[in-house]
Amino acid sequence: LLISCGIDRHLKKGEKFLSLGEYYDAADQFKQAYTKTPAKERDNRGKIALKMARCYEKINSTPKAIAAYRNAIRYNQASLDDRLAYARMLLKNGEYKQAEKEFRILVDSMPDNVLAKNGLKSAQKAPIWKKEGSRYKIKKMDVFNSRRDDYSPMLLGDEYDQLYFTSTRNEAEGDELSGITGTKAGDIFLSEKDDRGKWSKPEAIGGGLNTAYDEGACCFTPDGKE
């Protein structure tokens, strides 16, 4: 009885967080409910796994979303739309053979579904494209990247030697973690290129622009003055 009450409490909290769009906190509550649900309650475990999967998908936690979708499928609680989401997660994660297998099942069940048909083509062609390589040379810029989210870069300056971007790295203002993403709120950072072409370590913009709340993608006027 106590275990059942604990499960219900986590589920109610999870649903509340979910209604607020706080997917990270919702996933955490659903995970605790899933862990406490006995293995013999297959239907309940499958339903909770599905809730977890959808939350993880929202916050771009692809490997966790895949694992949760697999459990939902294993417990026969995933609809065709859920299996489509699972197949697309596999494709996104580079698991092309497994994605192709899932998309084939979906095309057989939903022959008119454009997403399923396009997904199957993508899963078949992606390994070929990957093997052929790209005309572009891409390399990781360690000076810009952190272990958190770094996004929305904007170049500024006559020589485009100033790079502004948003980051949720540890140096961002505030101490609280977002219930949506599980990371700190985003701040705007700046890196500058010197005369030797070397970029500086990014630093948070001063002057009171950054706060403990989210400072999203920045933008500039065409003349770069504002």
Segments the model singles out, each with a brief description of its role:
Residues 3-22, 37:
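Bacterial Sec signal peptide processing site at the extreme N-terminus
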Residues 20, 58, 82-85, 92-226:
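Short, conserved micro-motifs composed of acidic
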Residues 32-35, 71-74, 107-108:
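Conserved structural position within tetratricopeptide repeats
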